A protein has these predicted regions:
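Non-catalytic, substrate/partner-engaging modules appended to enzymatic cores
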Residues: 1-381
Length: 381
């Protein structure tokens, strides 16, 4: 497979919308929503931290330096953007809590502010969040483009959006996935196992994005062309589909088509299950009750079946499903932005947007769907 970045397809068909977005502490804010309420008792202090111009890992090093706590003792649910104003929850052993107030000034000098202190019986672990609330400010926005943006947001609110991994996943030079493949091929290796695992996961992410874009292409072809033309397309791709199946797929109201053999998942969290009655599952998809999933290949990955598997096979890799430490999983192909709010400030030519996304989903994917710029990984995160 070609490992160079190819343009990823958009869900909707509007022309590109011109505006400026700068990922900065003024124009981009991220607020973590915790997975559970904290009990206010237990051996772990839980602090809500606001950081500015720092990555999560840089923040952890600062806490370690100032408080004397080992980085391994600090718990966090996920990585937050460096070029943003962000809040997230950090856990640390209770004995360090008295040092927080004493070091308020030292922390503020390093662009960190403690917003709240609580306690809980367990350490926060990766993935212990529901999702994130986002705020974005777009600049140099004309009234016409503001109207177009609102129309796109209406579509996204109704039908959702592709759950692409954001460009942050692939590094400054868009080559993390290439390094991940080299690790699998035993062509390179780094001293830190976490770095090796992250780079391999970047390769998984690259394959997922490519699979999702391919599925979008197939969905658009099903919607836009006749059954006869579709039969010819699938025949050329050596995919076995009959005319009755194609008619049923064209009748699905959602722009992203659920195929025979898809692995579904209850939304926003729940168990995986096979799509058996496609019409029924498409209706549940429209109601935001269940969503089709895509492959993150690995040793214990759950694979699709039938037509969905025929397409998925192109994006599997034997080195991933034989790698002992790469277990694999599945990821929502599609997500739904919630609590979407927007306002256009005409005199400033600015458009302000707020929304919520579930964990693992990227604001840059929503920006990409709105802006429709040509090329890949040109978002400004």
């Amino acid at each position: 497979m070609n490992l160079n970045f190819m343009p990823l397809l958009h869900a909707y068909n509007h022309a590109s919308i011109d505006f400026h977005f700068n990922s900065s502490t003024r124009d981009f804010c991220v607020h973590e929503v915790p997975l559970y309420e904290f009990s206010n008792t237990g051996e772990h202090a839980v602090i809500q931290v606001r950081k500015s111009g720092l990555s999560t890992l840089e923040m952890l090093h600062i806490f370690s330096q100032i408080l004397g706590v080992k980085i391994a003792e600090l718990g966090y649910a996920g990585l937050k953007d460096k070029n943003a104003l962000t809040t997230q929850f950090i856990s640390l052993p209770k004995k360090y809590a008295p040092l927080l107030e004493k070091n308020t000034h030292n922390l503020q000098e390093r662009n960190l502010k403690i917003l709240s202190l609580n306690y809980h019986h367990n350490k926060i672990k990766l993935g212990h969040l529901k999702g994130n609330r986002f705020f974005m400010r777009f600049k140099k926005m004309t009234p016409l483009n503001a109207q177009k943006t609102k129309q796109v947001l209406e579509q996204i609110t109704q039908f959702g959006m592709p759950n692409y991994f954001g460009s942050q996943r692939f590094g400054k030079f868009n080559d993390n996935h290439k390094e991940g493949l080299k690790i699998l091929q035993n062509k390179t290796k780094f001293a830190h196992q976490k770095l090796n695992a992250f780079l391999i996961s970047s390769y998984q992410s690259y394959l997922f994005n490519a699979l999702l874009s391919k599925r979008l292409e197939i969905s658009k072809i099903i919607s836009d062309f006749s059954v006869k033309e579709n039969l010819e397309f699938f025949k050329q791709k050596n995919l076995s589909v009959n005319s009755n199946t194609l008619k049923a797929l064209k009748n699905q109201a959602h722009p992203f088509k659920i195929l025979e053999g898809d692995v579904m998942c209850h939304y926003p969290y729940g168990k995986f299950f096979d799509a058996l009655e496609l019409g029924k599952e498409s209706e549940r998809f429209l109601k935001k009750e269940a969503v089709p999933t895509g492959l993150l290949d690995g040793k214990k990955a759950l694979y699709a079946k039938n037509l969905s598997l025929e397409i998925e096979k192109e994006f599997q890799h034997n080195l991933l499903n034989s790698h002992a430490k790469t277990l694999g999983s599945r990821r929502f192909f599609w997500v739904f932005a919630e609590n979407v709010t927007s306002q256009y400030i005409k005199e400033k030519a600015q458009f302000e947007l707020g929304f919520y996304l579930p964990k693992g989903s990227y604001a840059s994917a929503l920006l990409k769907e709105i802006k429709h710029e040509e090329g890949e990984n040109n978002d400004e995160f």
